[in-house]
């Protein structure tokens, strides 16, 4: 049999009151923080993704696809000129 690592068994941790006191606060807090991050629109700003109402402009109502890989830069310039 191999030696003990000196750590507490996982079953002892899960049945301890201290574990549940700490995690009953942190788990809901993480959920609320994530919900606020997305619902306030901060996630769009941090990651630079367009908001749902910015995918299509008034002039361009088609999907902005790059179709020619050799002229992709020119197509990107055309697609993003109104932004």
From Swiss-Prot:
Source domain of life: Eukaryota
Chief site of localization: plastid
Subcellular location: Plastid, Chloroplast thylakoid membrane
Topology of the protein relative to the lipid bilayer: Single-pass membrane protein
Biological processes, Gene Ontology terms: photosynthetic electron transport chain
A Gene Ontology term for the protein's cellular component: photosystem II reaction center
GO-annotated molecular function: electron transfer activity; heme binding; iron ion binding
Paired cysteines (S-S): none
Cofactor annotation remark: With its partner (PsbF) binds heme. PSII binds additional chlorophylls, carotenoids and specific lipids.
Annotated binding of heme, by residue: 23
Keyword presence, Transferase: no
Pfam families: Cytochrom_B559, Cytochrom_B559a
Cofactor(s) in the UniProt record: heme b
Membrane-crossing segments per the record: 21-35
UniProt keyword terms in alphabetical order: Chloroplast, Electron transport, Heme, Iron, Membrane, Metal-binding, Photosynthesis, Photosystem II, Plastid, Thylakoid, Transmembrane, Transmembrane helix, Transport
InterPro entries in UniProt: PSII_cyt_b559_asu, PSII_cyt_b559_asu_sf, PSII_cyt_b559_CS, PSII_cyt_b559_N, PSII_cytb559_asu_lum
Protein task: This b-type cytochrome is tightly associated with the reaction center of photosystem II (PSII). PSII is a light-driven water:plastoquinone oxidoreductase that uses light energy to abstract electrons from H(2)O, generating O(2) and a proton gradient subsequently used for ATP formation. It consists of a core antenna complex that captures photons, and an electron transfer chain that converts photonic excitation into a charge separation.
Subunit architecture: Heterodimer of an alpha subunit and a beta subunit. PSII is composed of 1 copy each of membrane proteins PsbA, PsbB, PsbC, PsbD, PsbE, PsbF, PsbH, PsbI, PsbJ, PsbK, PsbL, PsbM, PsbT, PsbX, PsbY, PsbZ, Psb30/Ycf12, at least 3 peripheral proteins of the oxygen-evolving complex and a large number of cofactors. It forms dimeric complexes.
Family: Belongs to the PsbE/PsbF family.
Protein name: Cytochrome b559 subunit alpha
Species of the source: Nephroselmis olivacea
């Amino acid at each position: 049999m191999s030696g003990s690592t000196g750590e507490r068994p996982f079953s002892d941790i899960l049945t301890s009151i201290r574990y549940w006191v700490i995690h009953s606060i942190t788990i809901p807090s993480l959920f609320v923080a994530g919900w606020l991050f997305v619902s306030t629109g901060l996630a769009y700003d941090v990651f630079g993704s367009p908001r749902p109402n910015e995918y299509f402009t008034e002039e361009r109502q088609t999907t902005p696809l790059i179709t020619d890989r050799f002229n992709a830069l020119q197509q990107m310039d055309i697609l993003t000129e109104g932004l």
